[in-house]
């Protein structure tokens, strides 16, 4: 009996999750960080293996997902962004160290600051998944791989359950699921699973505060994306009808179309068709430069940024250069230990695991595009952004996908779609740069990023952070050449600006803050006063002065001629508005002054009374026999009140959803030294 008792205790101890402190990462252990002069740019970090909660009865293997979290050390932010790279099978450390994380790895295998890091806007959580991606492992003797997105989704939900137990404060933050390329599949599946979990959870405090999803250059609709390759290549001049391979391309396009049209809607369909996958291969073959004087590294078009060239058959796998530094960084002595990993239990890091790709064939799951209408109809905020130079997941395919979507009572972008130009403002040089264009309709926002690749955060990091600013509504709205322009900036902290958020794109809920509500009530009060004074004739003098001033101006303009009627009623209306605002400002200052005087007077009167009044004491209770009140209390918070304990658990976190602009006048796949690790180029 005693044996079983101690065995049970041992089992419970072994199942216990590590503490938050055990996941802490010391910056001094990471090469390069000690050389950074501005220590405020170094984030607070947590990393390590997170055991997955075993909710799936068919999956008894213990799985550990590797995560790396970054947050600002100087400020508590109320938003958590979970970033996933795609592949499938590509590590999210691409995102952390090559794209939108706080650091990049230089050629000396040291960390340097990434000026466009997203962690200045929200806490960033990078997770390697599915199992056997990056540093995420299973303890089974034989390696097991996820074969369907439904299982991948369940595993990630198990990760979240464990993660929020270790980091409970994060569960109450606004949650955004983000990723790029093949993560266009992961992200909607996860969003749907979270919404389902919330619907089945009666306790509001146990729900996850999912607010939106961000997908960059997403592979969401395989059929539509495949059919967009040839039209996109033609529109960009990458190929023309005089190309000797053009007839072959047309036949390949027809095969793909016929395959899609002929499918039986009553039967389960393949996740994607081989006939459609082959179109991209045919385009690369047709555009290959085989002339003798062409350098070997310029033979093939880079599918991730079509304005660049690469060797064949790499066609982009040797790009970007920074990714080649990451394996060497993780191989440095002490790095794994600094990230709370046991070197004996993790494989050598490689960017993408092709085995994960081979196994995740999705024989049951449907493409994530079918999840989008329900997610949008639920009110979830959805942002899709695309680098315009990407061929693999090009913007033509994404826009065609949106045109087919039915949500919010309409199909695709409607006549009410708002269109904006988008500029990035560098305050250091006081210059604006064209960043792209924005389309917004209902709760869907599409952002085209100017001159950016498949990996927008890599080559346009500051622009990519603007995508987060647009979601958070930390933007300016200006008018330029008669068009509305959204402006994002280089500033680390947008709270430095008086940016009252009203939700110009409807991205945020547009709820005013308490201060804004009070100001609105005061404005209404002033308006009522003005109306009352106007009716009683109290403002006649002001009106008379305005009339006299206007008459004098007309006299000056019309000297030597007859009086003319007002030719610009708009200017007259603007002048009336300015007069009204001045009067309102006067009333507001007067009202505030009265409130301040009354408050100070009440305080002084209270002090005077307290000082000159004798203290009272209870006459019905003998003080010597009085018992402590707490002995008779039946609720715990009574003692807390008596001892002055504060019930506000986290006052430092900002309120969410208060946002509006000021008016101022997959990739997942990055290059690898091993060609066969690029899932997109498998058939090459």
Swiss-Prot record:
Ranges for region Disordered: 498-582, 641-684
Known EC number: 3.4.16.6
Compositionally skewed regions (Polar residues) per UniProt: 650-671
Active-site residues from the entry: 181, 390, 454
Glycan-modified residues: 443, 451
Family: Belongs to the peptidase S10 family.
Lumenal compartment segments: 17-588
Topology within the bilayer: Single-pass type I membrane protein
Compositionally biased intervals (Basic and acidic residues): 554-578
PANTHER family: PHEROMONE-PROCESSING CARBOXYPEPTIDASE KEX1, SERINE PROTEASE FAMILY S10 SERINE CARBOXYPEPTIDASE
Keywords, in A-Z order: Apoptosis, Carboxypeptidase, Glycoprotein, Golgi apparatus, Hydrolase, Membrane, Protease, Signal, Transmembrane, Transmembrane helix
Compartment(s): Golgi apparatus, trans-Golgi network membrane
Transmembrane segments: 589-609
Skewed-composition ranges (Acidic residues): 514-547, 674-684
Function according to Swiss-Prot or TrEMBL: Protease with a carboxypeptidase B-like function involved in the C-terminal processing of the lysine and arginine residues from protein precursors. Promotes cell fusion and is involved in the programmed cell death.
An annotated Gene Ontology molecular function: serine-type carboxypeptidase activity
Residue intervals annotated with topology Cytoplasmic: 610-684
Catalysed reaction, written as an equation: Preferential release of a C-terminal arginine or lysine residue
GO biological process, alphabetically ordered: apoptotic process; proteolysis
Signal peptide: 1-16
Enzyme class, broadest EC rank: hydrolase
UniProt protein name: Pheromone-processing carboxypeptidase KEX1
